[in-house]
Amino acid sequence: MITLIFISIGMTLTSFVVSKNNLWPVTILQSAFLSIAAIALINNHWISKWHNFINSVDSMQLPLLVLSCWLTPLALIASKGHLNNLPITNQRTFIVLVIIITTSLIITFSSLELILFYIAFETTLVPTLILITRWGALMERFQAGLYFIFYTLFGSLPLLISLIALYFSSNSLSIPNVELVWLTTNSSTSLTVWWLLSILAFLVKMPIYGFHLWLPKAHVEAPVAGSMILAAILLKLGGYGLMRLISLFSTTSLNFSSLPLVVFCCWGALVTSIICIRQTDLKALIAYSSVGHMSIVAAGVFSQTIWGINGALMLMIAHGLVSSALFALANTMYERSGTRTLVITRGMKLILPLSTFWWLIMCAANLGFPYSNLIGEILYISWYGWSIWCSYFSNYNCVWGVYSLMIFQVSQQGPSSHFLLNVPTSFSREHLLFLLHLLPLLLIIPTPNLVLISWLK
């Protein structure tokens, strides 16, 4: 972990001193080296449930850590096109903010101390807010930033209160120590209150349906790198927090509230799928689809089953790659057409046929088509034996496929608008970007052990 943090610090320093002509190549090369260093952890045989008492890398954290480092160079590659014409100071600031977010995510996904986890968890807010308000497309970006900061901050305050109460009760905020002390020295009532305070921050951060109002605004107004990082990684902080703290929750509280929460999450996924069908803004549609997917992730965690939690992690990794690719594809269309309205950008297959291929692949992956995140969807079949109510909502969630097909049908089929006939063709940089999103997806089904939690019992 220290190696990854030092590489991130070196990237920050380099972005200030490298020349203008070499800024993007050097930064992307360094971020690629960061990705390789993270991938090298996969074959580390010393990785177990608890690696040491300050930082940990287990089979729950490792996939999310690798995903964070993998998407950093991809976000920079996607942003290079529209940032090249800005002043060099703005370009350096943008790169530094992306690196700060990556460093905070590395600390978050490798932290055993809950207070360090909370600090790194909240540190991601400030650079993301600056990305939205400074490099957003329209004046509504300030309102989007206001929604983003207030929802996430007010949702995190109860978590801070619960951590303070946890420290005074157990004299420690290290997760292994808390597992031994907290559950044996507190009543079921105090554990229930602590559980209710803790999950609110994660439900807002994911977010599930009902806590999601900040997400569509933030996605629509954010630049492409902000949307990619927000959808692919920052939303996963909520799911990771739920999975990490699930062992500290009261069994009585979980058994009492699991069924209502799982049913609510499944119902929210169904509602957001219907909302997606009514959307005309491409980025808003992808943002609402993220709400639906993360609601299903929360349902898998709340089910407390091995298959449900493994399915949640599998779906988070696959959704991170697919949603990032969809936002990158939406950005390529926006750069050429100047609009995100689906009806106006129709008929793109006649203008950008190679991009149509990537749209087909990613829309199919978004609905769980093999070889993508199908195994994550299969793991959720465990719901059928867990609760009959979940099986009902799971059957109705076939609506998911409708909006994924609608994205491809409306944007790629039909006659082209006349003002789109002279747009530039696709660049090799863009095809490389989409290919690097696809390659990890193809590894999930043949090698699921890279993602599944090995120590979970």
Curated annotation (Swiss-Prot):
Residues passing through the membrane, by range: 22-42, 59-79, 95-115, 116-136, 148-168, 191-211, 223-243, 257-277, 282-302, 309-329, 350-370, 433-453
Reaction it catalyzes: a ubiquinone + NADH + 5 H(+)(in) = a ubiquinol + NAD(+) + 4 H(+)(out)
Swiss-Prot/TrEMBL keywords: Electron transport, Membrane, Mitochondrion, NAD, Respiratory chain, Translocase, Transmembrane, Transmembrane helix, Transport, Ubiquinone
Pfam families in alphabetical order: Oxidored_q5_N (PF01059), Proton_antipo_M (PF00361)
Transport found in the keyword field: yes
Keyword Metal-binding: no
EC number: 7.1.1.2
GO molecular function ontology, one term from the record: ubiquinone binding
GO terms, biological process: ATP synthesis coupled electron transport; electron transport coupled proton transport
Function text: Core subunit of the mitochondrial membrane respiratory chain NADH dehydrogenase (Complex I) that is believed to belong to the minimal assembly required for catalysis. Complex I functions in the transfer of electrons from NADH to the respiratory chain. The immediate electron acceptor for the enzyme is believed to be ubiquinone.
UniProt similarity note: Belongs to the complex I subunit 4 family.
Protein name: NADH-ubiquinone oxidoreductase chain 4
Upper taxonomic lineage: Eukaryota, Metazoa, Echinodermata, Eleutherozoa, Echinozoa
